[in-house]
Amino acid sequence: MIRQQFAIPRIGWRVYVFYAVDALDTGVIERQLRAIGCNDTERVCRGIGEPNSGVTYTNTASRASVVVIGLTTSADEFANTYDHEKGHLVRHISQHLGLEPYGEQEQYIAGYVSQQMFSVAKSFLCEHCRQNNNALANFIRVFL
């Protein structure tokens, strides 16, 4: 599992992203969810460990979100899950801020989120790199 944290300073939002997650990582995800105020971690974490899956949880009161992207079977499946969960994140933020769903402000947030996540996500968008990252994540999980 690879962790990433970033802020969206203009709106005071914190984002915690977990990549290459499998079922063994559920405890870490649950702790982060509780830290941002999630009271139903069992329900939120139900699908963690399934290939090509993810989940995004947002607590608007604390202006914080947790994004989970599971292990994927291919680079294009990663791209699909990444876009899907990133879309949920942006929609959660936009709804809370009352932004027009077809307006520029939502797209500026989406662009900023993409830029922040790209530094990690890029290594999963290439099939060779994705396989190496999955192997590295498993090594870290087992030996560190």
Residues covered by each model-derived region:
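Active-site scaffold of zinc-dependent metalloenzymes
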Residues: 33-76, 92
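Post-HExxH zinc-binding segment in Zn-dependent metallohydrolases
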Residues: 100-130
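Long terminal regulatory regions of eukaryotic proteins
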Residues: 133-134
